[in-house]
Amino acid sequence: MRWITRPGWPGNLLALAAGGLTTLALAPFDFWPLVLVSVAMFYLGLRELSPRQALARGWCYGFGLYGAGTSWIYVSIHTYGGASALLAGLLMLLFIAAIALFFALPAWVWARWLRRNEAPLADSLAFAALWLWQEAFRGWFLTGFPWLYSGYSQLDAPLAGLAPVGGVWLISFALGLTAALLCNLHRLRARKSFLAMGVLLLLAPWVAGLALKDHAWTSPSGPPLKVAAMQGNIEQSMKWDPQKLNDQLALYRDMTFRSQQADLIVWPETAVPVLKESAEGYLSMMGKFAADRGAALITGVPVREPTGRGEYSYYNGITVTGQGDGTYFKQKLVPFGEYVPLQDLLRGLISFFDLPMSDFARGPNDQALLQAKGYHIAPFICYEVVYPEFAAGLSAQSDLLLTVSNDTWFGTSIGPLQHLQMAQMRALEAGRWMIRATNNGVTALIDPFGRITVQIPQFERGVLYGEVVPMHELTPYLHWRSWPLAIVCLLLFGWALLAARISKTV
């Protein structure tokens, strides 16, 4: 305990280990109690530190979290980006060192302005607000990297029932509050009224989560729809090879021709690995086949659009043909994968910065949803499904959710299963069915409670068959989003700052 709370390298090393523990609480390990241990160690580790010492302690925690939880970055850079093992390792370490600052800054803010060791109840509430703030901030700053939120650990745990009420961030707030209160219970015993309030605040989110876990916030807006989702399992080395184009198109054509009757036929991200205008004949043929069978065909395909200046913008898109309509352009792009920041400086340095289709433009904000079989479908391409607020905006207008992805970049790492877990949380938050079609897994159907009903294992070629049900009505989260929680956090911050100022003048 003394090493955790005091300054110095022993405490920093424990913070490093504490950050890594969160990874074990998330998919694919799912030992969720460890997230409470991790957050509690972060909280205790800042108790006696100066702001400068807290800055280092927070950075160590962030480095441990991202070092363990995003180790798949090395696979993407080395295996698929063409970088040497040494260079890939160096780039990964630089990336992790940079994003670890997401924890260094809130740790400094905590030690500088918010910490109130003399008032454990107020301290616990303020810490919960800070914990939520750091998660929201790292999902927003510089387009965001909303990965490894602590709330995802509760997908199959007691707090899952809070997701439709306030999203994954409400769960994270509850975890931060729980961890801090557990650390402070012995200090609350001095005053029985404070102890009673502390126990009430400790139990409330867990009781509410369990009570709401099986509550249905939405209801069907139509009959079940049959789905056939294709998983081609195409190697990334073949994906953009022009000599392999016809083989890939033939693969999805034949899988579709041989598939069972379905209302929705879904192909993954960039299943058509050529510009839409170059594949119009192929898409028209497949659309006619789908329409003749009473189905809508939804596929990922790159799209080129004129800008009006004799130039073109390229988009990562989804299009619907057959008994459906609409094209959607991806709005949340993956840095370096789909666009290169500072590209005039970085392009040409290593092949990782010159990957095929790494110069996409961002899709407009006001796009219409896809339509298929008379229903509105909220589309998310790969990385987009990890943004809670962004996903909520589209989900609120929809009957069904759809995410298409190419998780080949992750290799055999834990990345694809983390990605799947976040998609499950989006379905739970929205109270809607989700269709998830990927190139190499995990292709799955997810129900409104975030549970997988059917799936195809990773690295297998096949067709997933199942049913989804269009849903209407809004969960509280889709209706209010995170505004109530944001207001509560601001009030808690204000309370902590005011109380600290008063205590200094007394």
From Swiss-Prot:
State the top-level EC class.
transferase
| Any single GO BP term | lipoprotein biosynthetic process
Catalytic center residues: 269, 330, 382
- The protein's annotated pathway: Protein modification; lipoprotein biosynthesis (N-acyl transfer)
List membrane-spanning regions. 24-44, 58-78, 85-105, 125-145, 162-182, 192-212, 482-502
- A GO term from the CC aspect: plasma membrane
Q: What is its main location?
A: membrane
Where is this protein localized, as stated in its record? Cell inner membrane
Protein's membrane topology: Multi-pass membrane protein
Lineage: superkingdom: Bacteria
**EC number(s) given by UniProt:** 2.3.1.269
Task: Report the residue ranges that make up the CN hydrolase domain in this protein.
Answer: 230-470
Kindly give the InterPro entries that the UniProt entry links to this protein. Answer: Apolipo_AcylTrfase (IPR004563), C-N_Hydrolase (IPR003010), C-N_Hydrolase_sf (IPR036526), LNT_N (IPR045378)
The alphabetized UniProt keywords are:
Acyltransferase, Cell inner membrane, Cell membrane, Membrane, Transferase, Transmembrane, Transmembrane helix
Q: What molecular functions are annotated in GO for this chain?
A: N-acyltransferase activity
User: Where is the signal peptide, in residue numbers?
Assistant: none
Record NCBIfam families: lnt (TIGR00546)
Family the UniProt entry places it in:
Belongs to the CN hydrolase family. Apolipoprotein N-acyltransferase subfamily.
The record's function comment reads: Catalyzes the phospholipid dependent N-acylation of the N-terminal cysteine of apolipoprotein, the last step in lipoprotein maturation.
Q: What is this protein called?
A: Apolipoprotein N-acyltransferase
